[in-house]
Design a protein with these regions (language model features):
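N-terminal prepro-regions of secreted/extracellular proteins
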Residues: 1-51
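Post-signal peptide N-terminal regions of Sec-secreted extracellular proteins
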Residues: 30-153
Length: 153
């Protein structure tokens, strides 16, 4: 029994050390909305009324819908984040973009909802067949402490 206890403690220590290394290695590099709009860093501005095919979807609160969508914009297939539903002024949406399968990423935004029930989109970035080039959509309700993100696509 004593040996099993030591193994369990050793396994737990290894798991914690490994998890800590993974968390310590990744993270976002923030970019403001200006860093992701009007052609900056390859991003293009998208109308807040734009919609595309839904690649990922979460609804953390009833009718608070965060989508990762894609569509042809200016002749190029691009991905973007979209917040819709029962939005209020101050709700935020952004898109995370990675070129290394999620080890590090750029947070493009946040973009802020300006009035009640208004949809809001992030800027859009071209898609790629490269498996390391991924997006996820994220959002946070006005005054909330917790953010929600889709899985990577």
């Amino acid at each position: 029994m004593r040996t099993q206890g030591k193994r369990a403690v050793s396994a737990a220590a290894l798991l914690l050390a490994t998890a800590g290394a993974v968390v310590a290695g990744g993270g976002p590099a923030s970019a403001t909305a200006a860093d992701c709009s009007n052609g900056a860093n390859g991003f293009v501005t998208v109308s807040d009324n734009a919609s595309g095919a839904v690649a990922r979807h979460i609804e953390p609160y009833p009718e608070f819908i965060i989508n990762l969508e894609y569509g042809t914009i200016g002749g190029v297939q691009r991905g973007f984040a979209r917040l819709r539903g029962r939005t209020v002024q101050g709700d935020k949406v952004w898109m995370d973009w990675t070129r290394d399968a999620g080890r590090t990423w750029i947070q493009c935004g946040p973009f802020t909802v300006s009035y009640l029930f208004a949809p809001k989109t992030s800027a859009a970035q071209r898609t790629s067949r490269d498996a390391n080039w991924r997006f996820r959509a994220c959002g946070r309700g006005s005054g909330a402490n917790e953010s929600f993100c889709t899985t990577w696509w």
